């Protein structure tokens, strides 16, 4: 998956999610995920997650990420609960290393983990009857400063 220079996200159509089954992806952050955008460097980019009807800025859960000056990728639980935005740093991962990211909705909680890294978080967001897959998004307010490639394979 490539986010092109000057954009926030690749072109994609919304995908509905049926049931409460886990989302699993093998994710590899490539060296192109290193970037410098000045004062907005602390903004959190989005990787994948679940948005609930009517809008993901009401209730949603996503893995977030940003490049760290220590040459790692900071990973976040990034979510909206009843229209209020929250985020919590849950760990760091290296570049050019495949990781399995899992999001498991269950009742009013979503468990987020990265296998083999000891990274784990529980996010309290209530689901609605209708849900849709949220894909990669660069930003905050800034667009991608160059092509950003993240290798993503749904498992």
Protein language model annotation of sequence segments:
Residues 1-75:
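Secretory/extracellular carbohydrate-interaction modules
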Residues 84-89, 117-123:
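Surface-exposed loop/edge segments in extracytoplasmic proteins
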Residues 83, 107, 116-118, 140:
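Residue-level detection of beta-strand-connecting loop/turn positions
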Residues 18, 68, 92-96, 127, ...:
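Surface-exposed coil/turn segments at beta-strand junctions on protein surfaces, enriched
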Residues 25, 97-106, 110-114:
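Short tryptophan-centered beta-strand motifs in secreted/extracellular beta-sheet-rich domains
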Residues 122-155:
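Flexible glycan-contacting loops in extracellular carbohydrate-active proteins
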Residues 75-100:
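Short, aromatic/His-centered strand-loop micro-motif at the edge of beta-sheets
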Residues 71-75, 108-112, 119:
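Hydrophobic residues embedded in beta-strands of well-ordered beta-sheets
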């Amino acid at each position: 998956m490539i986010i092109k220079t000057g954009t926030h996200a690749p072109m994609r159509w919304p995908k509905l999610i049926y049931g409460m089954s886990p989302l699993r992806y093998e994710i590899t952050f490539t060296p192109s995920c290193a970037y410098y955008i000045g004062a907005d460097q602390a903004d959190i980019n989005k990787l994948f997650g679940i948005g609930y009807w009517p809008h993901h800025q009401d209730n949603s859960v996503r893995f977030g990420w940003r490049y760290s000056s220590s040459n790692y990728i900071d990973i976040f639980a990034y979510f909206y609960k009843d229209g209020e935005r929250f985020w919590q740093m849950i760990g760091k991962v290296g570049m050019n290393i495949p990781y399995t990211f899992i999001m498991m909705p269950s009742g009013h909680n979503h468990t987020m983990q990265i296998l083999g890294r000891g990274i784990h978080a529980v996010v309290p967001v209530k689901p609605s009857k209708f849900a849709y897959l949220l894909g990669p998004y660069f930003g905050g307010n800034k667009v991608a400063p160059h092509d950003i490639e993240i290798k993503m394979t749904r498992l």
